[in-house]
From Swiss-Prot:
Membrane-spanning residues: 27-35, 47-57, 64-72, 89-98, 104-112, 129-136, 149-158, 172-182, 186-195, 201-209, 213-222, 230-238, 240-248, 254-265, 269-279, 289-300
Single GO molecular function: porin activity
Signal peptide range: 1-21
Protein name: Outer membrane porin G
Record's function text: Forms channels functionally larger than those of classical porins.
Localization annotation: Cell outer membrane
Topology with respect to the bilayer: Multi-pass membrane protein
Record-linked InterPro entries: Bact_OM_Channel_sf, Outer_membrane_porin_G
One Pfam family this sequence matches: Porin_OmpG
Underlying gene: ompG
């Protein structure tokens, strides 16, 4: 599953590594690993919840950054030592920073991701192999000494085995907003988030969905410690993932609160922990309670 804040300190370390590499115009690297879990209370199909291990490697030189990652996701029954339908996801991204200064920054990312699905106890399904292409500009604009406007916009194209995986062939995703820095310790970010899956092919209607949220973060920096309480407030959400049985859209209302903690050892090593709870209401069926937790480690050199 996709999460915008998981292990933010690790992402920050990667960004710092890129900035340092640009200043020195030499190579800088970082490697890391994460283990994430997701669970909907009382939902038997996800067994004990989704397990999501991942590893990554980034290399930066001047305005260039190359990122490699490998991720898995699937339901796990820990007591029985088995898992349900799962997929693995190798990924390559290349980012180029066209402009970077205190007043304005602009970069562009291109990426390729492969989804390898392995179906368990699903009649008529064995494996599926789907690809995703990505292009994503990002920006940061200084409005005042304390106020900045920043964000990113990703455009995706999916191909192969879409009728099996249930994905739409096109997707856009963006998160953008304002950040106000009160002092070296406290800042506030308020963003608008949109993710929309749709089909450019008029003959298809599978996997279409829309999510709109307000996302607010309160980053606190206390020496080597970073703490970020955050929330996601649902504005509009619908899906038709079960298009084979019911082509009508189903409405949802999801609202989340979470807390991220990171620690930088000041020797290249950093670690992070995160937990989030989400209330999920649906037009069809009962409401759900969702839990997310993640732990990560990163080393920069």
């Amino acid at each position: 599953m996709k999460k915008l804040l998981p292990c933010t300190a690790l992402v920050m370390c990667a960004g710092m590594a890129c900035a340092q590499a640009e200043e020195r115009n030499d190579w800088h690297f970082n490697i890391g690993a994460m283990y994430e879990i997701e669970n909907v209370e009382g939902y038997g199909e996800d067994m004990d919840g989704l397990a999501e291990p991942s590893v990554y490697f980034n290399a930066a030189n001047g305005p260039w950054r190359i990122a490699l990652a490998y991720y898995q996701e699937g339901p796990v029954d820990y007591s029985a030592g088995k898992r349900g339908t799962w997929f693995d996801r190798p990924e390559l991204e290349v980012h180029y920073q066209f402009l970077e200064n205190d007043d304005f920054s602009f970069g562009l990312t291109g990426g390729f991701r492969n989804y390898g699905y392995h179906y368990v106890d699903e009649p008529g399904k064995d494996t599926a192999n789907m690809q995703r292409w990505k292009i994503a500009p990002d920006w940061d604009v200084k409005l005042t000494d304390d106020l900045r406007f920043n964000g990113w916009l990703s455009m995706y194209k999916f191909a192969n085995d879409l009728n099996t995986t249930g994905y739409a062939d096109t997707r856009v995703e963006t998160e953008t907003g304002l950040q106000y820095t009160f002092n070296e310790t406290v800042a506030l970010r308020v963003n608008y988030y949109l993710e929309r899956g749709f089909n450019m092919d008029d003959s298809r209607n599978n996997g279409e969905f829309s999510t709109q949220e307000i996302r607010a973060y309160l980053p606190l920096t206390l020496g080597n410690h970073s703490v970020t309480p955050y929330t996601r407030i649902g504005l509009d959400r619908w899906s038709n993932w079960d298009w084979q049985d019911d082509i009508e859209r189903e409405g949802h209302d999801f609202n989340r609160v979470g807390l991220f903690y990171g620690y930088d050892f000041q020797n290249g090593l950093s670690v992070s922990l995160e937990y989030a709870f989400e209330w999920q209401d649906h037009d069809e069926g009962d409401s759900d309670k969702f839990h997310y937790a993640g732990v990560g480690v990163n080393y920069s050199f």
